[in-house]
A protein has these predicted regions:
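Electrostatic interaction modules used in gene-expression and signaling proteins
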Residues: 1-132
Length: 132
C-alpha cells in the first residue's frame, strides 16, 4: 500500500493538543456525547490521537504492519457515523476481545470502507431475512 501523497500535510507540525481538538471536531464529539458515555468517547479520541501523533514508520492493524501514513490518512477521514458504527458494533459483539486496543484500531481503520456494506446487509436482512 503506497501513501498517496509525497507532500507533507499541514497537520504534520501539529502538537498533540491541537491534533486532539481537530479529531474531536471532525467526529462531532459534542453530538456523540449526547449518545455515548464520556469514557467510551475519550478512549476513542485518545486512540485516534495516538495514531495521528505517532512518529513510528508502521502500525499493526488487523495483524499486518501498515505504513503509518496510510493509516493516518484513513484516520483523518473518520467522521461521527464511523465512530457510532464502531461503538455500536462493540456493544453487539459476544466474543471476548483479548486485545481491545488492537480490536479498536482495526475497527476504526476499516470503518470508512465497511460501513456502507454493513448498512446494506442490515437492509437486506430486514427486507428478506425474515422470510425463512
Amino acid at each position: 500500500y503506497l501513501y498517496s501523497s509525497i507532500y507533507p500535510s499541514k497537520r504534520d507540525g501539529m502538537d498533540r493538543r491541537e491534533c486532539r481538538a481537530e479529531v474531536k471536531e471532525s467526529i462531532e464529539y459534542d453530538q456523540l456525547r449526547t449518545i455515548y458515555r464520556f469514557d467510551e468517547l475519550e478512549e476513542i479520541v485518545d486512540l485516534i490521537t495516538d495514531v495521528l501523533c505517532s512518529t513510528r514508520a508502521t502500525i499493526r492493524i488487523g495483524g499486518e504492519d501498515l505504513p503509518i501514513e496510510a493509516v493516518k490518512d484513513r484516520f483523518w477521514r473518520l467522521e461521527q457515523s464511523h465512530i457510532e458504527y464502531v461503538l455500536d458494533r462493540m456493544k453487539e459483539t459476544t466474543t471476548k476481545i483479548r486485545n481491545i486496543r488492537g480490536y479498536l484500531l482495526t475497527a476504526l481503520y476499516n470503518a470508512p470502507t465497511t460501513i456502507n456494506h454493513h448498512f446494506q446487509a442490515e437492509v437486506q436482512h430486514d427486507l428478506y431475512g425474515k422470510q425463512h
